[in-house]
Amino acid sequence: MNNIQLAHGSGGQAMQQLINSLFMEAFANPWLAEQEDQARLDLAQLVAEGDRLAFSTDSYVIDPLFFPGGNIGKLAICGTANDVAVSGAIPRYLSCGFILEEGLPMETLKAVVTSMAETARAAGIAIVTGDTKVVQRGAVDKLFINTAGMGAIPANIHWGAQTLTAGDVLLVSGTLGDHGATILNLREQLGLDGELVSDCAVLTPLIQTLRDIPGVKALRDATRGGVNAVVHEFAAACGCGIELSEAALPVKPAVRGVCELLGLDALNFANEGKLVIAVERNAAEQVLAALHSHPLGKDAALIGEVVERKGVRLAGLYGVKRTLDLPHAEPLPRIC
């Protein structure tokens, strides 16, 4: 069959053929090969790596499915892996659920699944259990994916936004808004093809460079809502305020151009391969050096600080501070 049919989700022969010829082959690993209703994971590896489990789930509905730098499949691995990794854990296992629209081209599904398998394998992640549903035309837009992931948090790592205090500083691991601007360019046909590429990446290797540095306090990956959403979460968790410097924000010229053209702010744009990191001030130089030593952190910068006065503010290019509010809604729906 060249297209997904309702029969592919019925539990019958068509579904078994899809599972065996596509998912089992692409995601092949010992846990999946058991074909039980659940993945049976040996605790020994997890216990050896930490004393707590980090467990996260996310759903992916991005439109379009394919974009410069990635696709919904790569995103479904990177996004959930990063949500686990910012705890200090190394993501090891993922589940995967597909909701497919009747009529979806089989080649589209194969391309997405192949990308998922390649991304997971490169990151040392096993997709150990999954599910597939097919719904009638129009009940879903082409293809939605849910993934859940887990890893073990080392006993000596206790990162968390509630530990922030006045005097701490904030770093970002690279340029802001690459993913959001890339998707916006595609949707609005702004003609910047070639200049904009999503930053979609698994950040575990970058985060590992920070695990042994004293003074690292909290990490978040700045996805929906961008850096602005993360700093508001940090401020709410610690009960302090946060002040950012506009002049310090690393933004690529093409992304800045999109923002100026449409009256948007890169601080609110989604990223899929960037960290916001809170550290003690005296650790900032060492953390920046570690980030700069890795390709995923080469554009890292110190962008702000935690202050006693509550609220989130942005110091403009001429030093004037203004309150930085969260938008009422995501400026770019279905961004991930």
From Swiss-Prot:
It comes from the Bacteria. It holds the Pfam family AIRS_C. One of its GO terms (biological process) is protein maturation. The modification S-carbamoylcysteine is found at C336. CDD domains: HypE. InterPro entries: HypE, PurM-like_C_dom, PurM-like_C_sf, PurM-like_N, PurM-like_N_sf. GO terms for molecular function: lyase activity. Involved in the maturation of [NiFe] hydrogenases. Along with HypF, it catalyzes the synthesis of the CN ligands of the active site iron of [NiFe]-hydrogenases. HypE catalyzes the ATP-dependent dehydration of the carboxamido group attached to its C-terminal cysteine to a cyano group. The cyano group is then transferred from HypE to the HypC-HypD complex or the HybG-HypD complex. Homodimer. Forms a complex with HypF. Also forms a complex with HypC, or HybG, and HypD. PANTHER family: CARBAMOYL DEHYDRATASE HYPE (PTHR30303:SF0), HYDROGENASE ISOENZYMES FORMATION PROTEIN HYPE (PTHR30303). NCBIfam families: hypE. This is Carbamoyl dehydratase HypE. The gene is hypE.
